[in-house]
């Protein structure tokens, strides 16, 4: 298109041709040659406005916000030289940043920044690949005063242009430069609208990312037919909020008010939110949004499954614990109780033993166990032994109702001694029954040793019929309870056996 723009009163910088420009050593590694057809461009400081002459176009570039070179001194200037496809020698000046454009592939443009070692490719037809580059270079640091025209912003005005065909057909569009972007419907068209407004001119230099640079060369191939693919680009409308509405506001009176008026408030509402830019910069792609959705949905499902599984497991574990824990708890106190019982029993036995010993000691001190002087081997006879036993039994303590009698039973001749066995019978007769039905017996044994001398006393021992405890005279105190236990057990036994009276 041969649309001409009115240049401002500022001076434009001349463009160097590769045939006349001097080649200098590049500061960045591996700069690429430029094959852009017969168009030259010059880069000026961000403070200066953009000048577009008859066959010359100027683009202002600002360094990345990371390097903090958004505003350069007015003395220093950056030039971009575009050489013919035949001449492949790049022209680079010292202390200057160079950007080369290559259009070897159809509908694609490759931008290399020699200073920052970055390469970016831009599709002229589809605007999707431009978004990740904008994401990498972070447009969010642009000053709020300067109105930035993002590459995706023209989507909304282009859609509106598709609906209003008279924008391309109106004759005054040739005179007004902002009508050009409506015709080719490319992201550069929106830059033309910005150039129409004098105060908005600095908005172009604010765009640091490389993808904005190739937007200017897209102007020549902008036919009206491209409006249709732009309409198809409407699905990319979500990134449209990045475009500031202030730049679109001036053309509203030129175009029909009914169509442009609704667009402005919607864009303003989107611009008010400062976080929209950050969100678009970070996840602008549709696949990223899908991934985020998947990430959001999958953890919820997993959490639900895990929660259900955990609940089921916990239920099972709870059941097991309910079965096991009470048993363990019951066992533990049981064991503790046993330990306590054992300790109590041990303590009781110890205490009882101590008490018994003390009582015995006191009793022995007050009433010692009585004993007699037994016969010697030279004095011993069977009859004397019986009398000795009756004399010994008389020393025991028992009630007067008990009567006893001792008699000799037998003599056992062993190899080394003679055993003389005696029986003492106890009974408790009454006036009703002078002859007791049962009696308690105690068996005494006098051991006469054949090898011992005659002056040594004989060995005496005795047991009661209800126990096998072997007792010796003077060692254990006699208890009347022993006799009662024997007689009671015999009474119980006799009552259990029926007798026939003849």
UniProtKB/Swiss-Prot annotation:
Disulphide bridges, residue numbers: none
Role: Binds to type II regulatory subunits of protein kinase A and anchors/targets them.
Pfam name, any one: AKAP28
Keywords linked to the UniProt accession: Cytoplasm, Repeat
Annotated spans, 8 X 4 AA repeat of P-X-X-P: 199-265
Lineage: Eukaryota, Metazoa, Chordata, Craniata, Vertebrata
Reported tissue expression: Testis specific.
Subcellular location: Cytoplasm
Region (Disordered) residue spans: 1-84
UniProt region (RII-binding), positions on chain: 258-378
GO molecular function, one term: protein kinase A binding
GO biological process: spermatogenesis
Keyword Cytoplasm: yes
GO CC terms, sorted: axoneme; cAMP-dependent protein kinase complex; sperm fibrous sheath
Annotated source species: Rattus norvegicus (Rat)
Compositionally skewed regions (Polar residues) per UniProt: 11-20
Main location: cytoplasm
Source domain of life: Eukaryota
Protein name, entry field: A-kinase anchor protein 14
Subunit organization: Binds to type II regulatory subunits (RII).
Biased composition (Basic and acidic residues): 24-84
Intervals holding Sequence repeats: 199-202, 205-208, 211-214, 217-220, 235-238, 241-244, 250-253, 262-265
Gene name, Swiss-Prot/TrEMBL: Akap14
């Amino acid at each position: 298109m041969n649309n001409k723009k009115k240049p401002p009163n500022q001076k434009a910088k001349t463009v160097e041709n590769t045939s006349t420009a001097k080649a200098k050593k590049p500061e960045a590694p591996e700069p690429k040659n430029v094959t852009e057809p017969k168009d030259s461009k010059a880069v000026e400081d961000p403070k200066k406005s953009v000048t577009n002459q008859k066959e010359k176009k100027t683009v202002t570039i600002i360094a990345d916000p990371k390097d903090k070179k958004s505003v350069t001194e007015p003395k220093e200037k950056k030039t971009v030289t575009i050489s013919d496809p035949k001449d492949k020698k790049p022209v680079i000046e010292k202390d200057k940043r160079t950007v080369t454009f290559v259009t070897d592939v159809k509908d694609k443009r490759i931008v290399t920044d020699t200073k920052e070692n970055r390469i970016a490719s831009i599709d002229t037809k589809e605007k999707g690949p431009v978004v990740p580059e904008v994401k990498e270079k972070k447009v969010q640091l642009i000053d709020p005063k300067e109105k930035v025209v993002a590459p995706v912003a023209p989507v909304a005005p282009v859609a509106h242009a598709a609906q209003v065909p008279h924008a391309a057909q109106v004759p005054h569009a040739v005179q007004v430069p902002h009508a050009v972007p409506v015709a080719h419907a490319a992201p550069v068209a929106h830059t033309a609208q910005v150039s129409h407004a004098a105060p908005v001119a600095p908005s172009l230099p604010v765009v640091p990312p490389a993808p904005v640079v190739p937007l200017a060369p897209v102007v020549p191939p902008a036919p009206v037919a491209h409006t249709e693919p732009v309409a198809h680009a409407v699905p990319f409308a979500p990134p449209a909020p990045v475009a500031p509405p202030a730049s679109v506001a001036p053309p509203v009176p030129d175009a029909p008010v009914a169509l442009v008026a609704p667009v402005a408030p919607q864009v303003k509402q989107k611009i008010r939110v400062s976080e929209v830019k950050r969100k678009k910069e970070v996840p602008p792609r549709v696949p990223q949004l899908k991934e985020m959705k998947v990430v959001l949905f999958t953890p919820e499902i997993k959490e639900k499954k895990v929660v259900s599984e955990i609940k089921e497991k916990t239920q099972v574990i709870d059941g097991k614990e309910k079965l096991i824990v009470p048993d363990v708890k019951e066992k533990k106190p049981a064991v503790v109780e046993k330990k306590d019982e054992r300790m109590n029993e041990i303590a009781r036995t110890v205490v009882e033993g101590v008490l018994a010993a003390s009582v015995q000691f006191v009793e022995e001190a007050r009433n010692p166990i009585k004993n007699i002087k037994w016969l010697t081997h030279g004095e011993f006879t069977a009859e004397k032994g019986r009398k000795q036993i009756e004399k010994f039994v008389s020393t025991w303590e028992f009630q007067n109702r008990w009567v006893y009698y001792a008699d000799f039973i037998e003599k056992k001749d062993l190899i080394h001694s003679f055993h003389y066995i005696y029986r003492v019978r106890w009974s408790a007769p009454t006036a009703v029954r002078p002859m007791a039905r049962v009696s308690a017996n105690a068996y005494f044994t006098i051991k006469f040793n054949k090898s011992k001398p005659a002056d040594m006393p004989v060995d005496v021992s005795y047991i009661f019929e209800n126990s096998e405890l072997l007792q010796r005279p003077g060692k254990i105190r006699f208890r009347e309870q022993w006799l009662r236990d024997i007689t009671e057990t015999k009474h119980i036994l006799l009552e259990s056996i029926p007798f026939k009276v003849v």
